[in-house]
Amino acid sequence: MGYCSGRCTLIFICGMQLVCVLERQIFDFLGYQWAPILANFVHIIIVILGLFGTIQYRPRYVTGYAVWLVLWVTWNVFVICFYLEAGDLSKETDLILTFNISMHRSWWMENGPGCMVTSVTPAPDWAPEDHRYITVSGCFLDYQYIEVAHSSLQIVLALAGFIYACYVVRCITEEEDSFDFIGGFDSYGYQGPQKTSHLQLQPMYMSK
């Protein structure tokens, strides 16, 4: 009963991860955030494999899913540090999330709740010609906190998924080991010990 509930919980967690990361992927595409797009794509593939392993009782797939979650948590911690500008990171000058190939920022920067975008003219000399220079004001919630909330949710789901993945792998392994020792589908018939008769041969004498 416990194994069934743990397996069903892991399936639910995987489903939640897929929904949340697909939502995040859409907005990362709109903001041309190439590094998060690549990370999200890999995460989607691994979660699908983990979901398949959970449904089909494949411990190797679930183990691979659990290992990936460690890397996924690390990535999301980095994203949080990036947007909160921890250490030497700067969300304004560093273009890590776009692989330094564009100056795009998070989609939420211009489209957050209550945000008002104003174009600035003339644009500074350093601004690329194919980009517009803007100011954003009036946001109810700054875009960096929205991105931090997205990453925090992913971390919570990943930690829950890691715990239940380890539990499901242990249950599947124990079930397989116990089944092997029992030999449930042994095709050989059971034969009880047979009694052997011991005959004592004695010489016979015949009279002429």
UniProtKB/Swiss-Prot annotation:
Keywords: Cell membrane, Membrane, Transmembrane, Transmembrane helix. Its main location: membrane. It is found in: Cell membrane. Detected in the brain only and specifically in neurons; expressed in multiple regions such as cerebral cortex, thalamus, cerebellum, olfactory bulb and brainstem, but not in the hippocampus. GO terms for cellular component: plasma membrane. It is a multi-pass membrane protein. The chain crosses the membrane at residues 1-23, 35-55, 64-84, 148-168. Disulfide bonds: none annotated. Belongs to the NKAIN family. Interacts with ATP1B1. This is Sodium/potassium-transporting ATPase subunit beta-1-interacting protein 2. It comes from Mus musculus.
